[in-house]
């Protein structure tokens, strides 16, 4: 058995034919780790005295067992175990319709697994390790909490587009001493000392970007309005060209979850990587500005301005610079 110390980056659950599977990605001094836990169960709790025999929810297969736990009012509870997370979700919806009280039915299996082991983010891992392409994988290892301060790798990402629904003209990323720009165009027509790689069309641009991101392999993706604009736009253009959006580690597909209701944010689900948005993080730290436009915030904090300000002519100026000053 091998031992590792890592820091939790992302967690996912997925229903399989063999039951619920939990996947955790960690950053460690030995490189990225992928922990897979198979044959797990989704769990919620119900009052011991509540019967289910005649309820429609009883048609969903679950195993009911008494446990040594009580509700907040001191009453005994039973645990309900489901082979798949979707079964618990369906059961919870039916129970609510029928006025049946459940406890902790909203806690996802991947979160409960960590909570029951008192793990927050740093953890010690012990198990049989297998080396994969760019990461180490452990199946059903032992885990426990530990003190660990990681040195996370990062890249800052920014794209420029031809309007609000046109092609991506350039993708730039930098971090930890690395700077790189991918741009549509012909190298023979443009002379520059900047670290630019020229690509013939948008599809080639996207494919090279995903290739380079996998090679640079950051733990964190940084940006301004990162999820709502850059990552969402990249996903849409990949879909347009039928290019797999493999921004996750191990070649896994990233997804930008769209809001279900007005005012909700988009959420980036990127296996093995964390997207950190500058706007969200400043707001979380209780910073307040007249405008959260990048140019305004940069001027307020750093005394610097963007080359292209957020004006009504911004798109026209981007197009002009792309034509004349690449």
Which functions belong to the PLM regions below?
Residues 1-280, 284-326:
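The two-metal-ion catalytic cores of nucleic-acid processing enzymes
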């Amino acid at each position: 058995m091998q031992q590792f110390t890592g820091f939790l980056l992302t967690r996912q659950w997925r229903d399989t034919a063999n039951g619920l599977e939990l996947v955790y990605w960690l950053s460690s001094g030995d490189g990225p780790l992928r922990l897979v836990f198979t044959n797990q169960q989704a769990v919620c709790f119900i009052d011991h005295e509540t019967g289910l025999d005649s309820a429609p929810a009883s048609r969903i297969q679950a195993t009911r067992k008494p446990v040594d736990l009580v509700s907040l009012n001191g009453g005994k509870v039973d645990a309900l175990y489901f082979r798949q997370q979707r079964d618990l979700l369906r059961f919870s919806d039916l129970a609510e319709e029928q006025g049946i009280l459940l406890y902790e039915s909203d806690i996802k299996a991947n979160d409960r697994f960590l909570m029951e082991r008192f793990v927050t983010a740093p953890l010690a891992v012990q198990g049989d390790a297998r080396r994969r392409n760019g990461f180490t994988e452990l199946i059903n290892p032992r885990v426990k909490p530990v003190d660990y301060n990681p040195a996370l790798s990062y890249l800052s990402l920014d794209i420029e587009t031809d309007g609000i629904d046109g092609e991506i003209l350039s993708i730039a990323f930098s971090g930890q001493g690395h700077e790189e720009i991918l741009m549509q165009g012909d190298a023979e027509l443009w002379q520059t000392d900047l670290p630019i790689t020229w690509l013939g069309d948008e599809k080639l641009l996207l494919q090279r970007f995903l290739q380079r991101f996998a090679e640079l392999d950051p733990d964190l993706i940084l940006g301004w309005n990162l999820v709502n604009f850059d990552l969402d736009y990249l996903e849409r253009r990949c879909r347009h060209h039928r290019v797999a959006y493999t921004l996750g580690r191990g070649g896994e597909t990233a997804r930008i979850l769209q809001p279900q209701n007005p005012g909700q944010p988009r959420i980036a689900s990127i296996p093995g990587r964390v997207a950190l948005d500058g706007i969200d993080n400043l707001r979380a730290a209780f910073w307040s500005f007249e405008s959260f436009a990048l140019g305004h915030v940069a001027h307020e904090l750093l005394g610097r301005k963007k080359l292209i300000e957020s004006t009504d002519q911004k798109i026209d100026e981007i197009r002009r610079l792309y034509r004349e000053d690449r």
